[in-house]
Amino acid sequence: MSGLHILAFGAHADDVEIGMAGTIAKYTKQGYEVGICDLTEADLSSNGTIELRKEEAKVAARIMGVKTRLNLAMPDRGLYMKEEYIREIVKVIRTYKPKLVFAPYYEDRHPDHANCAKLVEEAIFSAGIRKYMPELSPHRVESFYNYMINGFHKPNFCIDISEYLSIKVEALEAYESQFSTGSDGVKTPLTEGYVETVIAREKMFGKEVGVLYAEGFMSKKPVLLHADLLGGCK
């Protein structure tokens, strides 16, 4: 296959939506191919079931315009630095050949989110080594960025999602089992105004960069701008 433009990894289905659903919708609307890879089935989540979460993930993907979504069924709360996990992620990277890869930001209250970022970073490096898993052709990712799930960290750069906030909210609301208690659910940090908190964060980031809403991202490397700083104005 020719490869994805963007491949976003998350520890659980809904992680990617929380961090960058607006950005994904923005790029799929422009015709770019975007994929999502969830590492676990979130089987330890307080609400919902594995089967329901997978159905919700399919709905959210469709809302964002994502045609490729995978789940590696790694153990929830067991995302440790293991060679077998790195190899599985390398297979995904080499199969789908993304230009850009995203994963959660390392500083997050949930250990699975931080460990997901570390595993993906290791896999990106290994995916470019020719003699590592030689049965698959090597692939070098052009850039690796981190999106935010929990917290209000100061981003290295932002992407304007003002026109796509409604899609982000719709994608999040697809996870009804996670963001509302329902008749048989229990209260968690996700059910107590979490979506509203995410919206407030994107509004804050937007205010800092002069737009209505924006998603913030982190990068360990300097970011090269591909647009005129003056927007073509003279």
From Swiss-Prot:
It catalyses: (S)-malyl N-acetyl-alpha-D-glucosaminide + H2O = (S)-malyl alpha-D-glucosaminide + acetate. The keyword Transferase does not apply. Pfam families: PIG-L. Signal peptide: none annotated. It comes from the Bacteria. GO terms for biological process: bacillithiol biosynthetic process. Gene3D superfamilies: LmbE-like. GO terms for molecular function: deacetylase activity; hydrolase activity, acting on carbon-nitrogen (but not peptide) bonds, in linear amides; metal ion binding. Its cofactor is Zn(2+). Zn(2+) binds at residues 12, 15, 113. Its EC number is 3.5.1.-. Homohexamer. Trimer of dimers. Involved in bacillithiol (BSH) biosynthesis. Catalyzes the second step of the pathway, the deacetylation of N-acetylglucosaminylmalate (GlcNAc-Mal) to glucosamine malate (GlcN-Mal). Belongs to the PIGL family. This is N-acetyl-alpha-D-glucosaminyl L-malate deacetylase 1. It comes from Bacillus cereus (strain ATCC 14579 / DSM 31 / CCUG 7414 / JCM 2152 / NBRC 15305 / NCIMB 9373 / NCTC 2599 / NRRL B-3711). The gene is bshB1.
